[in-house]
Amino acid sequence: MAEIIKVYKQTLPAIRFIGKKFDNFGGWNEMFANGWLGIIENIAGGPEVLYHMPNYGKDGDAFIGLERHKSGEPLEVWIGMFAPANTEVPEGFVYIDYPEGTNLGVCWIYGKESETHNPIGECAGKITNGGMEIVPDKDGAVWSFERCQCPRYTMPDDKGNVILDYCYFVK
């Protein structure tokens, strides 16, 4: 059974999310099938550049599944990667720029890959119980994301478990 093993605050450098926008979680299959994540990784400079982004480090080489939630509006899912600020955006992709100093509340969810999404609903409470305040955007929507970091999420440990990062934007 997967469980939340760590909760912490992380401050981002100026960073650019590059990806594709979907109306459901099924976009992951399309991203992999079309090689779109590889395109983003390459245009961002590859794993070596992503691993060494100032103030972001090893979290840089990760697939990101952004989610926008607002009552009365359809779910938005944006799948892609964070890249250094001002990275060129390939044609057909969308981007969101985050300024330096953007804060995240991060939960590490440890368990079998097939179970790591089960405790996501507990993350908001764990983050607020940790003294952080989740902040909506200017339109009142709450953004969160899963960060599938390599190798934390992609290489199971000796028990066959991985760590999925689940993040909210916080003050």
Question: Which residues make up each language-model segment?
Answer:
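A solvent-exposed interaction/effector surface
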Residues: M1-K171
